[in-house]
């Protein structure tokens, strides 16, 4: 489970970068509304 936790953290870090880039791109934001949803 430790390895899975490390992988999840790495994925989350990468995912946040992709999300930020996508959400700053109007076309990407329109095509991926679930990515840019803020709570």
Swiss-Prot record:
Database matches in InterPro entries: Conotoxin_a-typ (IPR009958), Conotoxin_a-typ_CS (IPR018072)
UniProt KW Secreted keyword: yes
Main location: secreted
Keywords, sorted A to Z: Acetylcholine receptor inhibiting toxin, Disulfide bond, Hydroxylation, Ion channel impairing toxin, Neurotoxin, Postsynaptic neurotoxin, Secreted, Toxin
Propeptide feature: residues: 1-17
Tissue occurrence: Expressed by the venom duct.
Localization (cell): Secreted
Location of region: Ser-Xaa-Pro motif, crucial for potent interaction with nAChR: 24-26
Intrachain S-S bonds: 22-28, 23-36
Effect of residue 35 to D: 1.7-fold increase in inhibition of alpha-7/CHRNA7 and complete loss of inhibition of alpha-3-beta-2/CHRNA3-CHRNB2 nAChR
One GO cellular component, as annotated: extracellular region
Pfam families named among the record's database cross-references: Toxin_8 (PF07365)
Recorded superkingdom: Eukaryota
One GO MF term attached to the UniProt entry: ion channel regulator activity
Note: The mutant ArIB[V30L,V35D] is a potent and selective competitive antagonist of rat and human alpha-7/CHRNA7 nAChRs, making it an attractive probe for this receptor subtype.
Domain notes: The cysteine framework is I (CC-C-C). Alpha4/7 pattern.
Family: Belongs to the conotoxin A superfamily.
Protein name as catalogued: Alpha-conotoxin ArIA
Native organism: Conus arenatus
